[in-house]
Structures are given as structure tokens and as C-alpha cells.
Swiss-Prot record:
Protein family according to the UniProt entry: Belongs to the short scorpion toxin superfamily. Potassium channel inhibitor family. Alpha-KTx 09 subfamily.
Biological function: May play a role in blocking voltage-gated potassium channels Kv1.2/KCNA2, Kv1.3/KCNA3 and Kv1.6/KCNA6 to a lesser extent.
One Pfam family here: Toxin_6
Keywords assigned by UniProt, alphabetized: Disulfide bond, Ion channel impairing toxin, Potassium channel impairing toxin, Secreted, Toxin, Voltage-gated potassium channel impairing toxin
Domain remark in the UniProt entry: Has the structural arrangement of an alpha-helix connected to a beta-sheet by disulfide bonds (CSalpha/beta).
A GO MF term: toxin activity
Entry superkingdom: Eukaryota
Assigned GO CC terms: extracellular region
Name of the molecule in the record: Potassium channel toxin alpha-KTx 9.11
Keyword Disulfide bond applies: yes
Upper taxonomic lineage: Eukaryota, Metazoa, Ecdysozoa, Arthropoda, Chelicerata
Cystine crosslinks: 3-19, 6-23, 10-25
Expression sites (tissue/organ): Expressed by the venom gland.
Length: 27
């Protein structure tokens, strides 16, 4: 469990539990 909302550059996608500084998104 981490963040559910991604930063602006990932907006509209799902964030991985490593959403801290650079969030990685999966489609």
C-alpha cells in the first residue's frame, strides 16, 4: 500500500507503491 494518486506527469494512471519522488505508473 502506497499512494493511489500519481503526480502530474502520471495523471490519469495508476501509481505503484513507490510513489514518492519519481512515481512509476502502469497502464
Amino acid at each position: 500500500v502506497g499512494c493511489e494518486e500519481c503526480p502530474m506527469h502520471c495523471k490519469g494512471k495508476k501509481a505503484l507503491p513507490t510513489c514518492d519522488y519519481g512515481c512509476e505508473c502502469n497502464d
